[in-house]
Amino acid sequence: MNPNYLDFEQPIADLEAKIQELRKASTGPAVNVETEVRALRDKLRVRTAQIFRDLSAWQVSQLARHPQRPYTLDYINTICDEFQELAGDRAYADDKAIVGGLGRIDGRPVVIIGHQKGRDTKTKVARNFGMPRPEGYRKALRLMKLAERFRLPLLTFIDTPGAYPGIGAEERGQSEAIARNLLEMAELKIPVICTVIGEGGSGGALAIGVGDRTLMLEYGTYSVISPEGCASILWKDAGKAKDAAEQLGLTARRLKDLSLVDKVIREPTGGAHRNPQQMGKRLKAVLLNELDALEKVPLETLLQQRYERLRSYGAYEGR
C-alpha cells in the first residue's frame, strides 16, 4: 500500500519516485542499477530520519490523522489471537464509531474497546468519521461492565476527532454519556490500560480514556480541542492552526513531560502507517508488559492509585 505523502514529506516522495523510475527504466547492467538504487536508499534513510527527528506539533497532528494510519480494528487483527466483536448499547442502537468485544492476546483474555474510522467514503460515513454518538459510549460502558463482571483486563484504543456534536446526539444525552463513562471507569475493579493510537479529541477521547495507565503512540495527539478549532476561537482564523498546535501542547513527548501520559511508544520511521505490522508488535509487547505489572497490584491499591492519579492532573498558581 503506497502511503499518501504529507506536504513536509515531499523530499521523501521525490527520492522514492526516483528509485521507482530507476528500476523501471533500467537498461544497463543490473549491478550498476542496484548500486545506484542502494545509494538512493541510503540517502532516503538519512533524509527521512532528518525530517522526522524534529517534527512540529502541527506536523505531528497531520500524522495522527493520516488516512492510512492503523485504526483500532487493524491493531486488534495484529495483536489478538482471536476476537469476537459485540454490538449495541441494549437501549437505542449500535454505533459503529465505537468497536469492542472479547479477545485473547497470547492466550490472555481481555476486553478491547476503541474508536474506529473508515477508509473510504462509504465506511467513513458508516463509522461517522470516528465521532461516537451517545449509544457508542453506552455500548462501551456495557462492555466495561462486562469486563468487570468477568474480571477481565480492559484495553481501550483512542482515535477520534471528538464526540459527535449533532442535535440528535445532544438530545439523546451526549454529555451525560461521556460523564457517566468517566465516573464508571474511575471505579472499575479491573486493570484498565488506555492507548492513544491517533487523535485524542477532547471529551470524545476521555470517555474511554480513564485508566491505570495511559500510553500514547509517538505521533498521536491528545488535546481539549483540535488546532483548527482552537485557532477559530482564539484568533477567528482557522489558518492559524499551526500556532494553535504549538500552544496546545498536544504531542506525546509534551504530554509525557506533563505526566499526563505514562509511556510513549516509538513508531516506525515515517509513522505507524509505514509499517503497521511492526507497530502492532511493539504495541502488543508494551501492553503485555503493562498488564503483567498491573495484575500484580492488589485491587484496593490499584483503585487508590487510580484515584490519586486522577487527582494529580493539572496545576494552578495560588495568589
UniProtKB/Swiss-Prot annotation:
Q: What keywords is this UniProt entry annotated with?
A: ATP-binding, Cytoplasm, Fatty acid biosynthesis, Fatty acid metabolism, Lipid biosynthesis, Lipid metabolism, Nucleotide-binding, Transferase
List the GO terms this entry assigns under cellular component, sorted alphabetically.
acetyl-CoA carboxylase complex
Query: SUPFAM superfamilies recorded for this chain?
Result: ClpP/crotonase
Name one molecular function that GO assigns to this entry.
acetyl-CoA carboxylase activity
Q: Does the keyword Lipid biosynthesis apply?
A: yes
**One biological process term in Gene Ontology:** fatty acid biosynthetic process
Give me the reactions it catalyses: N(6)-carboxybiotinyl-L-lysyl-[protein] + acetyl-CoA = N(6)-biotinyl-L-lysyl-[protein] + malonyl-CoA
Q: What EC class does the entry list?
A: transferase
Enzyme Commission no: 2.1.3.15
**Which ranges carry the CoA carboxyltransferase C-terminal domain?**
32-293
Main subcellular localization, coarse class?
A: cytoplasm
Q: Where in the cell is it found?
A: Cytoplasm
The parts of the chain that form a coiled coil are none
Source taxon at top rank? Bacteria
The family database entries (Pfam families) matched by this protein are listed as: ACCA
Question: According to its UniProt record, in which pathway does this protein act?
Answer: Lipid metabolism; malonyl-CoA biosynthesis; malonyl-CoA from acetyl-CoA: step 1/1
Instruction: Give the protein's biological function.
Output: Component of the acetyl coenzyme A carboxylase (ACC) complex. First, biotin carboxylase catalyzes the carboxylation of biotin on its carrier protein (BCCP) and then the CO(2) group is transferred by the carboxyltransferase to acetyl-CoA to form malonyl-CoA.
User: How is this protein organized at the quaternary level?
Assistant: Acetyl-CoA carboxylase is a heterohexamer composed of biotin carboxyl carrier protein (AccB), biotin carboxylase (AccC) and two subunits each of ACCase subunit alpha (AccA) and ACCase subunit beta (AccD).
Q: Which family does it belong to?
A: Belongs to the AccA family.
PANTHER family recorded: ACETYL-COENZYME A CARBOXYLASE CARBOXYL TRANSFERASE SUBUNIT ALPHA (PTHR42853), ACETYL-COENZYME A CARBOXYLASE CARBOXYL TRANSFERASE SUBUNIT ALPHA, CHLOROPLASTIC (PTHR42853:SF3)
HAMAP family for this protein? AcetylCoA_CT_alpha
Q: What is this protein called?
A: Acetyl-coenzyme A carboxylase carboxyl transferase subunit alpha
Traced from the root, the source organism's taxonomic lineage reads: Bacteria, Pseudomonadati, Pseudomonadota, Gammaproteobacteria, Lysobacterales
